[in-house]
């Protein structure tokens, strides 16, 4: 990444993610955006942008926001610690009253909601098991997963998920070097290096799912596993659970084992540990590379990117809601 901290990656899609890791100004001149700071003025043609992730103090002109809204391009904002702050969510053009009504029905109806909540946890658990199997780690996820069908409330389902994830992190620790072991899961703030990467990665994935939901007819605030509170896109939290093992956890393990991320890529405080600018850039570059990575889809019979898998998951949910096909969560097959 250059000194401006503006990284543009992505080999599969014409439009790219742009990651801004330094302070600056985003302004518009006709159909081109410019990222400006004290060191440079970088043009970003609007037809090259898929989404923007800002990790610095970013000032945006109203003209730039109008153009981004017109083109349906979201911006996700993170604070200096890498925690998600919010998103600029463009005017929605794919809204469907019928889909929104069906979404609401599946929240109000207890049986329909619990069915979906269980599906999200089952998908997450099976992907965790795939990660552990990939590294040859014995695990008891299948045993705990048996408790899912007898869970009769969302709270019970969340408790099963919490037990599975705790056992999962303990199992991952068995293959990590001592300095990178997770130990206790700590979040705000994370207290060690791997906790820092998990928190950073989960926030990043959450915003990626928000972008994919924007490109569907789903309302991102209506959710099933996580409570649909105000001021958050809780459906993105639901779908993120399924993809955390695939996109975030495997990537973190790989970065550690290949020594691509080292102790000097973190800043340590009295009670916290966070990725520094060097660490953020390495993490973002690898994340974007993986989003563009493709796998042969077993049902479609063609290669699709990891990013596309997220969108396809949203489409599967829509089919379930409108009664076309029962939802089956994504599970890694490779």
UniProtKB/Swiss-Prot annotation:
GO biological process: defense response to virus; maintenance of CRISPR repeat elements
Cleaved signal peptide residues: none
A Pfam short name: Cas_Cas1
The protein's enzyme class: hydrolase
Presence of the UniProt keyword Hydrolase in the record: yes
Cofactor dependency: Mg(2+); Mn(2+)
Keywords from the UniProt entry: Antiviral defense, DNA-binding, Endonuclease, Hydrolase, Magnesium, Manganese, Metal-binding, Nuclease
NCBIfam families: cas1 (TIGR00287), cas1_HMARI (TIGR03641)
Family statement: Belongs to the CRISPR-associated endonuclease Cas1 family.
Protein role: CRISPR (clustered regularly interspaced short palindromic repeat), is an adaptive immune system that provides protection against mobile genetic elements (viruses, transposable elements and conjugative plasmids). CRISPR clusters contain spacers, sequences complementary to antecedent mobile elements, and target invading nucleic acids. CRISPR clusters are transcribed and processed into CRISPR RNA (crRNA). Acts as a dsDNA endonuclease. Involved in the integration of spacer DNA into the CRISPR cassette.
Protein name (Swiss-Prot/TrEMBL): CRISPR-associated endonuclease Cas1
Organismal lineage: Archaea, Methanobacteriati, Methanobacteriota, Methanomada group, Methanobacteria
Gene: cas1
């Amino acid at each position: 990444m250059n000194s401006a901290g503006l990284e543009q990656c992505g080999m599969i899609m014409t439009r790219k993610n742009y990651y801004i890791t330094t302070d600056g100004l985003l302004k518009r001149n006709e159909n081109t955006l410019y990222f400006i700071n004290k060191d440079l003025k970088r043009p970003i043609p609007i037809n090259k942008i898929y989404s923007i992730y800002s990790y610095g103090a970013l000032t945006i002109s109203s003209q730039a926001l109008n153009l981004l809204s017109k083109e349906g391009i979201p911006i996700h904002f993170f604070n200096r610690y890498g925690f998600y702050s919010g998103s600029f969510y463009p005017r929605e053009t794919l809204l469907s009253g019928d889909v929104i009504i069906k979404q609401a029905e599946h929240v109000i109806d207890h049986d329909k909601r619990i069915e979906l909540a269980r599906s999200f946890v089952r998908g997450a658990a099976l992907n965790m098991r795939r990660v552990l199997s990939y590294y040859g780690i014995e695990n008891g996820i299948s045993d705990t997963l048996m408790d899912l069908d007898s869970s009769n409330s969302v709270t019970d389902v969340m408790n099963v998920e919490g037990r599975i994830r705790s056992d999962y992190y303990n199992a991952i620790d068995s293959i990590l070097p001592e300095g990178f072991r997770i130990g206790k899961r700590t979040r705000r703030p994370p207290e060690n290096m791997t906790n820092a990467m998990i928190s950073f990665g989960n926030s990043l994935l959450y915003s990626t799912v928000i972008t994919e939901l924007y490109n569907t007819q789903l309302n991102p605030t209506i959710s099933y596993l996580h409570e649909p509170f105000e001021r958050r896109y809780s459906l993105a939290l639901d779908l993120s659970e399924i993809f955390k093992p695939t996109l975030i956890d495997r990537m973190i393990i790989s970065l550690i084992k290949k020594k691509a991320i080292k102790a000097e890529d973190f800043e340590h405080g009295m009670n916290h540990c966070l990725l520094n600018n060097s660490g953020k850039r390495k993490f973002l570059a690898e994340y974007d590379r993986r989003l563009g990575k493709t796998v042969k889809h077993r049902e479609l019979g063609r290669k699709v990117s990891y990013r596309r898998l997220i969108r396809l998951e949203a489409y599967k949910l829509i089919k379930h809601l409108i009664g076309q096909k029962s939802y089956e969560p994504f599970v890694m097959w490779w």
